[in-house]
Regions:
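Catalytic beta/alpha-barrel core
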Residues: 4-8, 34
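Helical hairpin unit composed of two closely spaced alpha helices linked by a short loop
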Residues: 10-12
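His/Asp/Glu-enriched, well-ordered alpha-helical/loop segment
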Residues: 14-107
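C-terminal cap of metal-dependent C-N hydrolases
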Residues: 95-143
Length: 143
């Protein structure tokens, strides 16, 4: 299944128990539904899914821990890619789909780990930070 958290929140259909789906071993991808949302940004979908899962945890089921950014990133990449074949991961035999992002303008007073840099990027992302894109191993033009 594909979860579109912003759309679900905007049209008030509820908050999916994403953690439960993952724990059951279901294939779960993350999407951005422009019909019910306001952006196609997968980074926004990542942060919205984390926020939604925290709300579900706090208001509905405190036994079901909220998603982490790493969980949501998995759903946005490997989870969603699992529906389309060998995409969504940097592994041998998989198609190379990637973006190169420059986060140097996101100031921080201390050195951050790669995990912390990525989490910060998810919450502060704009398209202007993409410096290169690759689809199926080929560099493509940036819009």
């Amino acid at each position: 299944m594909i979860l579109c958290p912003q759309s679900n929140m905007n049209v008030a259909t509820g908050i999916a128990p994403a953690r439960k789906y993952l724990e059951r071993g279901l294939k779960v991808g993350l999407g951005s539904d422009l019909a019910g949302g306001s952006t196609l940004s997968i980074f926004r979908a990542i942060t919205d899914s984390v926020v939604a899962s925290k709300l579900r945890w706090r208001l509905v089921d405190q036994n079901l821990k909220p998603l982490s950014v790493a969980d949501a990133f998995y759903m946005a990449t490997r989870g969603g890619g699992s529906f389309f074949g060998k995409v969504g991961a940097f592994e041998e035999g998989f198609e190379m789909d990637a973006v190169v992002i420059d986060d140097s303008a996101l100031y921080t007073p201390k050195k951050l780990s790669m995990h912390d840099r990525f989490e910060r990027l998810c919450y502060l992302y704009t398209d202007s930070k993409i410096v290169a894109k690759c689809v199926a191993g080929k560099k493509i033009e940036i819009d």
